[in-house]
């Protein structure tokens, strides 16, 4: 009996034959058994061809121990002949091997947490410190090596190394191995053995009844529930309840499942875990759980050694119904002020969440009013339609006056002759209506000198706040004996006379003076005024700041004690004296000339913005709002979008204007002006907003409002202003998030913005309030008035608003006169050129079928636009590669939009136009047809056709909007973009806008930063919840890399969307759509004019070689050979360390090269297959790869591209409509319906094909794959036949990171470097991997007999590699750390004369010393001295 037979007998005896891999069962050997009768031990020596999966290893050990347990203690010693992937298996076996040591259970648990690194025969275990290293090394090194060797590992030694940076993320790769498999594998393997012995089928296979509600274990008593925040240590039995915010269900190799749920009760969050139990339907209960459901759970709280946090190992879990927040009011309110995630870094939920909640509460309508933008409108419309609620569209904008005066109450006074009173007030607060002057100081200036001073305190008869004392350094004691303000102001008025007032931020100071004068019966001041703050902003535009401190430094004026009136006044006076001289130089000589001569078009930048609410009343109002938004973002953007009052007045039709929040003009007026002025301002508005007192608490805390009583008085004045002006007063919530517990996310986002003024204060509770909550907030107004402003007025205002639709419901394409006729004529003209005047019927049928759909649905203009763009590029000498499915259209081929011919494979005679088509599916690509001559005239036949159905492009009915994506050369792309302006006009084309939101990784940083700043510790689950709360909020805007939106000539952009600059960059060359382009994708034409390296590389190859790329044969045998072997390059696999010759060929990265090695393609159609397989999801791995490995089918017959499905099924006999449905279902990852499966089986489609379809999640279009391969084959042609042209082009166009020191070495040295980097590949960073890619190409080039020279100061170009003999000379840009501008500068400096020394090089080209040292090491500076020697001729 052979040793292999012995192993099979053993496997049969311990009953695991059917559990082992076939290769192991057939090739395993039982080499000997060592028996010790004395010790009752048997040691089995077993040789295996490969490692057992860890779970199968434990199964084997359990089975053999159980079989012989009554005879002896059994151990096994394995030898593995093929140790491939030893490092992978070492990680999985790590826990088992640790268990074989004599360490304590606690220490074993600690050791299992450690990171493992396998390098050759050395195993490295990363530990936290030297104490651990010494302990583990002494305690288990020898026994751990022995345990690994017994498992078959070829290990020489184990090293325990310290790793100070051993953070949680470095352990992520061990989670599956340690936490889920290693911890459970022994138990799972035992259970598997028991199942096998019992020979019971899984009950879940026989009963698949769906579970509606999760209920596992015993009912949980509600009185045992405790808050999650109270769980701070391990406990035996705990019950909690919470809402699920994350759920992960994993299948283990044993077939069992583990569910990991993250729940929160909003006091804290916790991870809950549970394994499926034997013979239970737990899996179905797990599947019934989902995010948003509430559960009650009970179990053991323990420290999870992997995540280093407390988790609950559940014994019981049940889904519960949790009472949700209700709006119990009989009559509901309408919210008119609400911020979504589109309020940049401020609002939290998307509009859909608000709309759903409002609908659930029974609100009749809801508004959206994001800060400065309307980007939530498309989603708002969809959500309102879904939930049956009226959507009110609006925005909270920034209103500014068109010009902010510098001088008030102009006087006919010559500035140099005038007398000025420069004054300053210190007050108890900022409101001239509710606060008091405590100090009034002034200096009188004439002829450029201070001629008098005035300084008085006044008694406010109230204690000063600590804030005011700290700010002004005035104390209560200093004011006790001060005169009354009436006396001070009377004296001051007399002292001023008719002088011109001057103050820094004069509106503030004059507000207190005028209020005081009026209370004394004097009426407001009639003196002229000059505001030095606005004056500085106008005449010192180069300054970024204009505060008194800053200006004092700039003007050289001493400011000794800022915020004391007399010192501020004197400093302002001296600054003003110098400003008068500046005005004189600008031609401003009279007080009444200041505003006129110093005004400019940028005056809006100086104005202080006030918040304003704009509500769309009708469709005209929507368009006007779009115009306002656009102007604010494009024309009037200064730090923030601004709306000049004149702009609002121009486009006010169809809009309702509201007063907004405490930052609004009217609220400020109540604080600063008397009631008559307030009522005058109120008349400008259509409705007045008042918001809950809770939202204004911060104003009281910051002493901007004295107290609650004062706040209530402000409300009364606002209501009175509304009553007087005859406009409604409504209560609005200024909501920024849904529920109270969501507020933490807003705090985190605001805290992440150091310059945000909201950081200076405590954020109020800004949740979406119910009607009951709002009524309660305004109870102090009385029940009737509260109901009026909260319910009655909001509903009446909503009733005044018409139904508005912000998004069009159909496609509006541009018009091009004669497009239908031109596309038809062009298609047939080119078809006749190729196929002859007497067109084959298959050509006619395909053209007519396509043209009927294209012209009938108005798509001809889209084709014509694409044709013009491609033709322009071709005329300018740049090829264009098509993307997507456009190659499915024969009309696109005949109009030269794409080079891919979708007809079935066929021959065409270039002379007599004879053609022969292959319609039976026997040929994958026309390029694969054998060479053939024409039987009629003897000319070599052209081979064409990729067999791609048109239905894939425009849908089965031909009415799907065509999506024509084109790959232009990256360097030509801007020209193509600008050509659209020539075609349609500058005001008709815009870049497709995008919205960038906070990503999970970024949100994690925000959360950690916030918690650290606040000194708060939260467990991981709660951090995860907070991260989810911050994720998805708008952070910025951008633009699609190639998308151009085209507006038809009979409409304008505001019919579809506002416009803006990407990321508000006012220097951008293009404006973008304000809406994310996906929102209007079906309404306007989007051209995908993308940039790509391949066309650029083709252009360079053409320039170098003079070869027209279109003439390159696609079926060149030597070219095709490199996809399976490097022989045609004249190198061996060993020399270039690769089994193919595809280094640098498009779409041949490491993964795809492995696919090439596995499949060894020999035809164009097989390369198309590989392109499709490599771009799909679950198309290759675990699918086609296994089918090829097991021999079920070959590369040509697996499903590689989506179109293959339709073609294959039609050839199998299915109706085209059903074949199309199946293709669409599979490509979208939806699998197959029962009807589809039944139809496929009726037509004898094999089971493997059905199974393959069911696995696919996404699959690539064949036309796209064919276009990629066509470009790749052309580039490969140059690689094979014109190597130096290829390498020069590759390094110039595609490579970015170079190691020139290595590249100039001999081929053996380069190969050794590449080999070394391969051995360290898993540890390489991205930059090193990019360098490796370049060195792989260089190694190949060197072994083909070519070499790289060092940089040459005389010959190197700035950016391009140049050819010299059998060598390449690299450009300056290839030097690490040397940028584009410096590369240009070196060449420019060289043109002016040779470099005399390294010092000269540094001086002329601006090179850093490190760059010079690098060039020196490279050998690029031979005989160049450090410094130039002065000769007599230089004198």
UniProtKB/Swiss-Prot annotation:
Keywords: Cytoplasm, DNA replication, DNA-directed DNA polymerase, Exonuclease, Hydrolase, Nuclease, Nucleotidyltransferase, Transferase. It catalyses: DNA(n) + a 2'-deoxyribonucleoside 5'-triphosphate = DNA(n+1) + diphosphate. InterPro entries: DNA_pol3_alpha_NTPase_dom, DNA_pol3_finger, DNA_PolC-like_N_II, DNA_PolC-type_N_I, DnaE2/DnaE/PolC, DNAPol_HHH, DnaQ, Exonuclease_RNaseT/DNA_pol3. It is found in: Cytoplasm. The keyword Nuclease applies. Its EC number is 2.7.7.7. Belongs to the DNA polymerase type-C family. PolC subfamily. This is DNA polymerase III PolC-type. It comes from Staphylococcus aureus. The gene is polC.
């Amino acid at each position: 009996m052979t040793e292999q037979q012995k192993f099979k007998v053993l496997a049969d005896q311990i009953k695991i034959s059917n559990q082992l891999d076939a290769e192991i069962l057939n090739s395993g050997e039982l080499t000997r058994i060592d028996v010790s009768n004395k010790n009752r031990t048997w040691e089995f020596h077993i040789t295996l061809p490969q490692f057992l999966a860890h779970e199968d290893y434990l199964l084997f050990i359990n089975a053999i121990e159980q079989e012989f347990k009554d005879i002896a203690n059994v151990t096994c010693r394995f030898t593995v002949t093929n140790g491939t992937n030893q490092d992978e298996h070492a990680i999985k076996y790590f826990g088992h091997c640790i268990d074989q040591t004599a360490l304590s259970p606690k220490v074993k648990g600690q050791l299992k947490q450690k990171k493992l690194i396998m390098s050759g025969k050395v195993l490295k275990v990363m530990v936290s410190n030297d104490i651990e290293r010494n302990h583990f090394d002494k305690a288990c090194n020898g026994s751990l090596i022995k345990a690994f060797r017994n498992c078959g590992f070829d290990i020489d030694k184990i090293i325990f190394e310290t790793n100070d940076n051993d953070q949680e993320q470095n352990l992520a790769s061990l989670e599956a191995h340690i936490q889920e498999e290693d911890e459970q594998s022994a138990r799972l393997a035992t259970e598997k053995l028991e199942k096998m012995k019992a020979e019971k089928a899984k009950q879940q296979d026989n009963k698949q009844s769906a579970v509606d509600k999760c209920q596992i274990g015993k009912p949980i008593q509600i009185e045992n529930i405790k808050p999650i925040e109270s769980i701070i240590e391990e406990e035996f039995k705990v019950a909690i309840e919470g809402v699920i915010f994350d759920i992960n269900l994993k299948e283990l190799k044993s077939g069992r499942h583990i569910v990991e749920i993250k729940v929160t009760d909003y006091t804290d969050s916790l991870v809950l875990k549970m394994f499926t139990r034997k013979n239970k339907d737990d899996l179905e209960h797990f599947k019934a759980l989902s995010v948003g459901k509430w559960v009650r759970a009970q179990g053991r709280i323990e420290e999870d050694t992997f995540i280093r946090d407390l988790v609950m190992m559940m014994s019981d879990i049940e889904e519960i119904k949790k009472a949700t927040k209700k709006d119990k009011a009989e009559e509901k309110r309408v919210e008119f002020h609400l911020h979504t995630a589109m309020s940049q870094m401020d609002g939290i939920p998307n509009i859909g969440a608000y709309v759903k909640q409002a609908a659930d509460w029974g609100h009749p309508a809801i508004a959206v009013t994001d800060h400065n933008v309307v980007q939530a409108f498309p989603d708002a419309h969809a959500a309102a339609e879904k939930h049956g609620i009226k959507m009110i569209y609006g925005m909270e904008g920034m209103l500014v006056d068109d010009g902010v005066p510098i001088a008030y109450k102009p006087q006919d006074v010559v500035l140099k002759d005038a007398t000025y009173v420069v004054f300053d007030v210190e007050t108890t607060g900022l409101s001239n209506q509710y606060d008091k002057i405590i100090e009034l100081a002034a200096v009188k200036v004439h002829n450029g000198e201070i001629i008098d001073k005035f300084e008085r305190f006044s008694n406010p008869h109230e204690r000063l706040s600590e804030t005011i004392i700290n700010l002004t350094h005035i104390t209560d004691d200093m004011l006790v004996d001060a005169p009354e303000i009436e006396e001070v102001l009377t004296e001051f008025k007399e002292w001023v006379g008719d002088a011109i007032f001057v103050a820094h931020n004069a509106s503030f100071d004059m507000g207190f003076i005028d209020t005081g004068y009026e209370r004394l019966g004097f009426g407001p001041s009639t003196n002229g005024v000059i505001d030095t703050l606005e004056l500085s902003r106008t005449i010192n535009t180069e300054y970024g700041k204009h505060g008194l401190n800053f200006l004092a430094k700039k003007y050289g004026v001493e400011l000794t004690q800022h915020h004391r009136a007399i010192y501020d006044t004197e400093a302002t006076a001296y600054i003003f004296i110098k400003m008068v001289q500046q005005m004189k130089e600008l031609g401003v000589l009279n007080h009444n000339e200041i505003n006129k001569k110093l005004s400019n078009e940028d005056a809006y930048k100086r104005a202080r913005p006030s918040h304003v609410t704009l509500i769309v009343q009708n469709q005209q109002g929507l368009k006007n709002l779009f115009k306002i938004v656009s102007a604010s973002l494009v024309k009037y953007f200064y730090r923030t979008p601004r709306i000049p009052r004149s702009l609002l007045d121009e486009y006010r039709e169809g809009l309702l204007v509201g007063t907004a929040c405490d930052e609004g003009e009217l609220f400020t007026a109540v604080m600063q002006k008397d009631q008559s002025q307030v009522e005058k301002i109120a008349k400008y508005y259509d409705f007045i907003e008042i918001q809950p007192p809770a939202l204004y608490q911060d104003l009281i805390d910051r002493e901007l409002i004295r107290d609650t009583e004062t706040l209530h008085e402000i409300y009364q004045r606002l209501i009175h202003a509304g009553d007087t002006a005859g406009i409604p007063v409504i209560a609005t919530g200024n909501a920024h998030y849904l529920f109270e517990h969501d507020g933490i996310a807003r705090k985190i986002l605001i805290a992440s913005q150091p310059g945000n003024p909201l950081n200076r204060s405590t954020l109020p509770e800004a949740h979406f309030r119910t009607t009951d909550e709002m009524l309660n907030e305004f109870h102090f107004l009385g029940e009737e008035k509260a109901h009026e402003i909260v319910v009655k007025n909001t509903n009446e205002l909503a009733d005044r608003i018409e139904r508005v639709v912000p998004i069009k419901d159909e496609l509006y394409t541009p018009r091009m006169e004669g497009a239908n006729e031109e596309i038809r004529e062009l298609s047939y003209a080119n078809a006749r050129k190729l196929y002859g005047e007497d067109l084959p019927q298959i050509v006619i049928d395909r053209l007519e079928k396509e043209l009927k759909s294209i012209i009938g649905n108005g798509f001809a203009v889209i084709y014509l636009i694409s044709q013009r763009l491609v033709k322009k590029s071709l005329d300018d000498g740049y090829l264009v590669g098509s993307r997507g499915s456009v190659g499915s259209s024969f009309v696109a081929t005949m109009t030269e939009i794409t080079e891919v011919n979708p007809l079935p494979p066929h021959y065409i005679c270039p002379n007599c136009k004879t053609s022969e088509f292959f319609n039976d599916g026997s040929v994958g690509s026309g390029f694969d047809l054998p060479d053939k001559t024409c039987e009629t005239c003897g000319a070599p036949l052209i081979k064409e056709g990729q067999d791609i159905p048109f239905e894939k492009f425009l849908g089965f009915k031909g009415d799907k909007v065509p999506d024509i994506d084109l790959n232009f050369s990256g360097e030509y792309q801007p020209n193509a973009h600008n050509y659209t302006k020539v075609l349609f006009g500058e005001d008709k084309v815009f870049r497709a806008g995008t919205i960038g939101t906070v990503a999970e990784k970024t949100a994690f940083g925000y959360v950690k930063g916030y918690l650290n700043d606040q000194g708060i510790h939260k467990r991981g689950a709660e951090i995860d919840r907070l991260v989810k709360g911050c994720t998805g909020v708008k952070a910025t805007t951008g633009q699609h890399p190639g998308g151009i939106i085209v507006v038809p000539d009979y409409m304008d952009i505001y019919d579809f969307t506002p416009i803006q600059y990407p990321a508000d960059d006012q220097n951008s060359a293009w404006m973008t759509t304000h809406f994310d382009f996906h929102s209007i994708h079906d309404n306007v034409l989007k051209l995908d004019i993308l940039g790509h390296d391949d066309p650029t590389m083709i252009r360079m190859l053409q320039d170098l070689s003079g070869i027209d790329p279109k003439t390159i044969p696609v079926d060149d045998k030597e070219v095709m050979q490199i996809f399976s072997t490097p022989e045609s390059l004249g190198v061996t696999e060993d020399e270039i360390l690769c089994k193919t010759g595809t280094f640098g060929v498009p779409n041949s990265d490491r993964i795809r090269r492995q696919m090439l090695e596995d499949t060894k393609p020999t035809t164009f159609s097989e390369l198309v297959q590989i392109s499709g397989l490599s771009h799909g999801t679950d198309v290759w791995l675990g699918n086609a790869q296994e089918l090829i490995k097991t021999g079920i089918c070959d590369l040509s017959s697996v499903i590689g591209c989506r179109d293959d499905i339709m073609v294959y099924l039609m050839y199998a006999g299915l109706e085209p409509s059903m074949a199309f449905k199946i293709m669409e279902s599979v490509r979208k990852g939806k699998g197959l319906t029962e009807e589809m499966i039944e139809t496929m089986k009726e037509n004898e489609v094999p089971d493997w094909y059905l199974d393959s379809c069911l696995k696919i999640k996404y699959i690539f279009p064949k036309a796209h794959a064919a276009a990629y391969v066509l470009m790749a084959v052309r580039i490969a042609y140059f690689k094979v036949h014109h190597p130096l042209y290829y390498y020069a082009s590759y390094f110039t166009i595609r490579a970015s990171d170079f190691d020139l020191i290595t590249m100039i070495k001999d081929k053996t040295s380069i190969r050794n470097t590449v080999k070394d980097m391969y051995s360290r590949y898993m540890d390489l960073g991205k930059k090193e991997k990019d360098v490796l890619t370049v060195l792989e190409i260089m190694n190949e080039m060197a072994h083909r007999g070519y070499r790289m020279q060092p940089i040459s100061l005389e010959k190197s170009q700035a950016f391009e590699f140049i050819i010299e003999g059998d060598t390449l000379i690299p450009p300056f840009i290839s030097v690490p750390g040397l940028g584009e501008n410096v590369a240009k500068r070196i060449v420019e400096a060289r043109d002016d004369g040779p470099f005399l020394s390294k010092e000269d090089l540094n001086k002329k080209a601006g090179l850093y010393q490190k760059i010079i040292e690098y060039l020196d090491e490279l050998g690029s500076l031979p005989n160049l001295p450090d410094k130039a020697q002065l000769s007599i001729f230089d004198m």
